[in-house]
Amino acid sequence: MQETFKFLRCNSQGEAVEDKYSLETLKNHFVVRDEYNNLFRVFSSRDDFWEWEAAQPFEQKCFHEVVFGFLPQRLKFDIDFPVNKSYSNDNVDENVDDNVNDDDNVYDILDMIINVIMDVFYETYSLPYNINLTREQILLTDSIGLNKKRELKYSFHIILYTHSVLNNNEAKAFTSKVLENLPKHVYPFVDPQVNKSIQNFRIIGSHKKGSMRVKMFNEELADVFETSTTTKKSDTLIATPFETTCLPCIFTNVKETASSSCDTIQQSELEEVLKFAGTLCKNHCFLRVHKNLVLFKRTSPSYCEICKRMHDKDNTLILRVTGNKVYQHCRHDNKHSLLMGSLSGTNNFVETYVDQVMTKSIEVHESILFEELPDPQKHIYDESSMREYERVPTLVVKAQMKIGKTIQLRNYLQKYYGNNSISKQQTIRFVTFRQIFSKNIQSRLPNFTLYSEVTGDLDSYERVIIQVESLFRLTSTAEPVDLLILDEVESIFNQFNSGLHKYFAPSFAIFMWMLETANYVICLDANLGNRTYNILQRFRGDVPIFFHWNQYKRAQHDMYYFTSSRETWLNNLLKDLLEDKKIVIPTNSLMEARLLQSFIQKKFPEKKIGFYSSKSTAHERESHFNNVSYYWGLVDILIYTPTISAGVSYEDKRFDVLYGFFNNMSCDVETCCQMLGRVRELKSKCYKICLQGKQNYFPETIEDIEMFTLQKRDTLFQTISNHQLSFTYSKETGRPIYYKTPYYHLWLETMRIQHLSKNHFITRFINQIADTGAKVFILTGEKLETVKQYTSIKMEIKHQDYVNIASAETIDANKALLIKQNLKEGITVDQQDLFAYEKYKLLEFYAWHGHKITPKFVEQYNSFMTKQNYTGRVQISRGKTVYESLTMLQTQELNFHQWAMQHAEHHDLQYNYSFQSHMYAIMLLTKCGFKCVQDPNILTNEQLMAKLVDEFVQYDLSAVSFEFKLKKPNKTDPQTILKFINKVLGLRYGLKIHHNKGNYYIKNTKAGSLIPFVRQQIKQSPCVVSNLLPITETSSVKEETSPIKETLTET
């Protein structure tokens, strides 16, 4: 039985379905759109429709199911491939054979879409709710054939026929998640508009009017994709009043959302996560990341440790990251998983990673672009000494320390620039990165002039050894230099970003002139990287690079023991000291170096300790580093920071073992590894290393760093809209144009290396050591009562620093400037003057001159976080409104940027622009429903959660994550978003959105409580004068007054 209607909705032109049937009564009927006759047909049941449909002539079978959004429905996808489109495998999958036809290309993309659907289903329903989906539960139909223009067209419907969702909003959200995870080139093939509130969806056996392409089952297709072979017509219908499993309501229910929360794996974490796949990658290859899941494609059958059987179909392997733990999952068993290990920053990550290196489950060698040069441009060998260098315009030499790089360089100079050579009077410039290294080189090349031993013009000297900061003493001439030597070339590039240049612009200009124009360039470095390759290609690209690489593993007899446990490391150190061993201790932490010195002195007062850091006097560094054989021969324990690097080498076999302590808060991995080689010979060849590093999320590709850098400057040229703090480009200033200078490109390369170290410090450190041929092990040992003592000494050292600064002389601006200049010039400064200078800087920062300060004041207000929050509050409180404050800050930073781009570009790149960080922080705050940083408003749980869902589900937080170096949150989970927002507010202002008894309001963090907002300047403590919203009784001032007074009245 059926009824026909001209229209679906009520109107004045005729009878409509809606005139007779309510939405409630339509639940029990089957509504079909008859495209051929332009009618809507309402059947009492599906069986009535099938019976009637079978009797219709073929050309009139143009039927579409009318799916009402409020009804439960199957998840469905409409896939269309445009006519005459070329589906190149280069855009599909690197593992697909190049010689395939168009059918194969379409099928590759279709298979990719099915995989992504399964991945999203797994993350959304399988993990939280233990609901499975296999390929056998996916129905695939097609309507391949000629369209109206007689052109071949591919069209497919994918239906998850055993499951249904509550309504079209759930289906729409699931489809959006699938689209988010598809590659950009695949996205256009999937129709995103198939989940409307009223949706027409073609019925099996039907075709579109005027087209002969019939929607049908395809057994061959099902066999290819291993999908369902069902031919039951009702399984293809979308509206599902009964026969399916109804999935939980995920996307339209805030409370449900939290239960399935997960963090997205960042690019900086992916490398570490993939290491855990280890031998599993023999049968799988990496496919992509989806939220907190790493997905793999099967390449061959494999045994599953979870299911305890072989799998030969499906992409069953999944790695899930929860917190910092990495778990292995199988699609066929959602109840069980295997713990693979922990990401860096956790206690056992170092040990887990070393174990994988020991079992050769990880490839430790990081290939560089030089290795990809064609064979005629490479000389690669494995010998215990260096071969003769090639006479080529651009020569790059890589080899480990003590294999004879400098010996061969001397031979090269003698052969081509010696007394009997035609080039003996040609100009040679030997550039180094440290003054002490320059002196070391001169001792081996006595016929070169050392820049620091002569005054005035250096151009008159044919052969000069010069440090990068003094390059301004050279000038460009009509004739280029004949030979430019860059020893430790990676460190030279680093030095241009050190901020230590007094005359940066002329020094960098002469460096680039020599690099671009020199007849011959030789670059040498044991830690050669892609930065050198990219710089040479960019600025010497007119001549080919020749790569000379001796792969000899000189460190193959060295043994490295790694741990993340300071306690284990300290206990081993104490044991060796008790056995009277002589020990070397390099560390990239000044505090750790001071702590170790004090700790050892208390335990072993009879031992002589050599200690070198940035705090060592200039006289001590110069005299000792020029004669390390004597001075280091006097000590039992040698402790040093990165102030000692290349150029300082102790050759005697005096020390027994090296203990290194490194973290990712200081210099990069390459510098840390270089520090290990200052004592060349250890009796035991034993290195015991403690590595610590929190997880960071810095951009680490040139493209991302450049995008982030230019974006911060772009915002300075935009007009701020006071409504919802949005941006438009200013008509007056327009969009900025950036001139990408040589320094800009070098700076990007240097940032990339620094960010890689900050993000992957531990893995890169261990990899670089293992790549030298050294053996790596896990450091173990007995536990002793050392950590408490160690921590106690650390607190004593810090407290003494606070006392020394608080009690230091109060100096004026003139004396502070003199001390600053002496430090910059390397002139020795008295220790008491250093403390006085620190005190001056602290008082100057808070404009607190004339006030007496205590050690407690120094402890609280000299911290990085308190200073950062104070600066943020001052900047956002300058105007009468947040909008006005932002505009003032934007104008100030825009003026500086324009000046810097005209006068000193390096200042612009090294300047920390803060306007964008304020824009993001305030934007997050306003999206939550607060007007500004002092808004006393209180939101209910329901209000805030609704805001978090409405405002952030569609908002891309990538730029905010980049700005604050935070992990991007899962946008479907309000609590995760709130946690992310609080991190941003805490970093910028010392604030958080606090929850108490079902309500949310703005509250100070611990650091923020030290710097209250006030209407007028007060004499109690450093504070921020603010003209923003009125400060009420519930605001922060009242709650913070007490601890401030306690701080300042302490004696």
Curated annotation (Swiss-Prot):
This is Putative helicase/primase complex protein. One of its GO terms (molecular function) is DNA replication origin binding. GO terms for biological process: DNA replication. It comes from African swine fever virus (isolate Warthog/Namibia/Wart80/1980) (ASFV). Keywords: DNA replication, Early protein. The lineage of its organism: Viruses, Varidnaviria, Bamfordvirae, Nucleocytoviricota, Pokkesviricetes. It comes from the Viruses. May be involved in DNA replication. Induction: Expressed in the early phase of the viral replicative cycle. InterPro entries: P-loop_NTPase, Replication_origin-bd. Belongs to the asfivirus F1055L family.
